[in-house]
Every structure is written in C-alpha cells, then in structure tokens.
C-alpha cells in the first residue's frame, strides 16, 4: 500500500493511448492485487505470485445496494480540483463546524469535516526503481526527494461513507450506523467519545470535540456563536455538537431530506440535482458531483462509471460511496 493507493495520476499522452483499455488494465490505474494462501495461478505452488484483485475480497456478507431506493454518492475529479478550499469553507458554514484556532490545530485537535490533501509528484516511482535495480525501501526514499519542478495534486478528503465501514463495527454503543440510503450516519446523543471509530477509519476523517466550542470563552475570538445575536449564524437544520462526541461528514443529510420532502409535496419523483451538498454547490470548477447512484440517468452515476474512476485505498475493501477520477496532466509528472 503506497501513494498510488490513494491518489492516481497520468499524462494526457498516456491517457489517450490507453483510453479504450478495460478499467484496471491501464498503466495508470492497475488493478490492485493481494496475496492469498491459495494456488491462484495454477502453477502447483503457493507463493507470492498468487494474487487476487482487491475487489474480489469481501470481509462482510453482501447486501443489496444497487437499485434499492436512493443510494447517495459522490465523484470527485482530481483534474478539475484546484485546491481553493471553497468546499471546506462551505462545509464549515453549512454544518456548523466550529473554528478551533491555530493553538488547537497545533495540538492536533483540528476540526474539519473535509480537508484538502496535497501531494507532490516525484521523479521516481516503483517502475523506475525496478528498472534501475533499486530496492523497494531505497525507492521509497528517493520518492521523497523533491523534483526540480514538482507538480501538485489536490485531493478533497471527507468521510467516504463506506458500505463496509470499519468505524461501524467497533463502536461499542452503535453511535455510528449505516442508513438504508448508503450514508454513514452519527447519533450524537448516543456517542460516548471512545474514539475507536477514528482509530479504525483508514481515511482519518473523523474528529473529536475536545471542548464545547460555541460556549467556551477561550474560543470567542474566532468562534462567532458565543451570544444570542451571533448564534444566528448557525444553520438551524444542523445540530450543534457538544463536548466529548465524534463528528464527521454527513453528506449534508439535511439537504437530501429537504429535497425528498419537496419532491413528495409536489407529488413528483426526485430530480437529479435537486439534492446537492454544500461542497459540490460551492466548487467553482464543478470538480465535485453529488447525487443518487441508483439513478442510472444521474450525472454522478455517469461520472462514477467513467474509465478514470477509482476508490482510495481500494485494497482495504471498505467499498466507499465516494469515488475519485484520476488526475490527467498535459505535462509529465516532473
């Protein structure tokens, strides 16, 4: 598991040359293989050559998700993302995410439902290491060396709303559960703050409330909701979390519920685009697409089925409802 398991990138020349290649066979999006204790290749031996695709493994019993009601999902195009953080700001405003200040960030107590991860391209990769006979460990060391003119990849990262979420299986009080619409949801009144879910999350997107930020004088200089007038900046549709509970991205569940109610009152089916998250609405480059994955005519479904689409840390097998589209450059990654 390395950088390529999280962020994928390629050049325009390479992408066009392999555009029609079956997903998983392209050089820029190889299917991840995991070793198994079985004679997969039929050579009569069990060794390191016996591998299965990460998507063929399943640690949990399957349950129907396709074509059953709504299934909210998101697709993020890394080629379009410019790392402006407009989505992060919109998320803070929409979901009453507190501003904790630089002192708390210094203590690793930052509070964001989504963040922008930044990756720099290297002159080295595993293929170059193999060609030049450099060991794996030495290759990783050389990959840390900055290039003369490194390229950057911006990657929005939030809760991936996994269908097989590892956070749900470790919570001792069932404070984090999975809705029948594919959303990993939090029950704040049930949460006792063990932080087991944060430890078990492979994407590290869960945050803990160390204080009651809207009511603590220490944060009054940068947290506006400290008195009755300033509290009017808060979104009344989203609960203000108390001290000692976990919180994370909810895929703006208040917005999807509102869109469903409006459609029900109108006696019409839910139209594609009527439910949209704050981050997708604020994105100036339309890099974020949100909608119902079970709606075959939806924009998010067509984006999801794009040949560039992949899941971060696919080999973990958590089956996220958030997908990314491979970054395509006009110039080489150097």
Question: Model-predicted segments: where are they?
Answer:
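Non-ligating segments of multi-cofactor redox enzymes
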Residues: 1-334
């Amino acid at each position: 598991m390395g950088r390529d398991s999280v962020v994928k990138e390629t050049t325009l020349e390479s992408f066009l040359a392999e555009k029609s290649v079956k997903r998983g066979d392209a050089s820029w999006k190889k299917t991840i293989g995991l070793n198994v204790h079985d004679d997969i290749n039929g050579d009569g031996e069990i060794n390191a050559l016996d591998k299965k695709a990460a998507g063929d493994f399943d640690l949990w019993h399957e349950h129907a998700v396709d074509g059953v009601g709504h299934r909210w999902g998101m697709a993020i195009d890394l080629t379009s993302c410019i790392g402006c953080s407009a989505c992060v700001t919109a998320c803070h405003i929409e979901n009453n995410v507190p501003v904790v200040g630089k002192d708390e960030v210094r203590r690793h107590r930052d509070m964001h439902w989504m963040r922008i991860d930044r990756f720099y391209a290297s002159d080295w990769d595993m293929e170059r290491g193999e060609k030049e006979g450099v060991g794996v460990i030495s290759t990783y060391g050389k990959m840390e060396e900055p290039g003369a003119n490194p390229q950057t990849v911006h990657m929005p990262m939030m809760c991936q709303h996994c269908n097989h979420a590892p956070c749900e299986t470790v919570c001792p009080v069932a404070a984090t559960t999975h809705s029948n619409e594919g959303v990993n949801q939090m029950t704040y009144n049930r949460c006792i703050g063990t932080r087991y879910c944060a430890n078990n999350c492979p994407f590290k997107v869960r945050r803990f409330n160390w204080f009651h930020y809207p009511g603590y004088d220490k944060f009054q200089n940068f947290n506006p909701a400290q008195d009755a007038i300033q509290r009017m900046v808060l979104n009344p549709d989203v609960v203000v979390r108390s001290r000692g509970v976990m919180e994370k991205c909810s895929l703006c569940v208040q917005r999807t519920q509102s869109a469903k109610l409006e459609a029900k009152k109108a006696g019409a089916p839910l139209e594609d685009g009527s439910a949209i998250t704050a981050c997708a609405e604020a994105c100036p480059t339309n890099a974020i697409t949100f909608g119902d994955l079970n709606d075959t005519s939806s924009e998010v479904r067509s984006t999801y089925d794009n040949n560039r689409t992949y899941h971060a840390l696919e080999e973990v097998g958590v089956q996220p409802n958030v997908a990314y589209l491979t970054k395509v450059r006009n110039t080489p990654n150097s």
